[in-house]
């Protein structure tokens, strides 16, 4: 897959013929220096942007022929997202924030019980009805992880999920994501600038100058680029 921005003299190749696959249940890190292309790569996997050449396949389904509306519905069903900032709506409760992805048009409503179950798993069972502006930064990121999981996605994509946290809270969030990956057999693809923070993971994919290193191909792939 290739991603080019601009044209002629202003052309920049953000990703240059990259290819890798991820198996169900893997915890994968995407690492690289600032500007290396790692966030661009995550955007391609997350169907937030389209490649100039090539395709992204999820669960064996090539997404390149989908319309914009179809991409939106497919993304809401198959993908969960966690970002550096939790971006919870302050006036809503923790539970209401977590339920938001299930209320997106074209996506079936997720049972209330499922959201409560996920919140219990991330350790927020006592915070369900508290306003989002009344919880700590670590709790907010736990709620963001629950929000990413509430639709039972095929993959959770996390972009610098610990980048806005102190070291102790960041380590707690790392352990929580690993716990969710193991308990739910959930695939996580995480962009980070600090691979050491995550310890042992299934695979590390390094992006440098738009190229991918240390990736490998396996059978029974869940994501193919």
Regions found by a protein language model. Give the residues of each.
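ABC family nucleotide-binding domain
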Residues: 1-200, 204-207
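Conserved beta-strand-loop-alpha-helix hinge in the C-terminal portion
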Residues: 203, 211-225
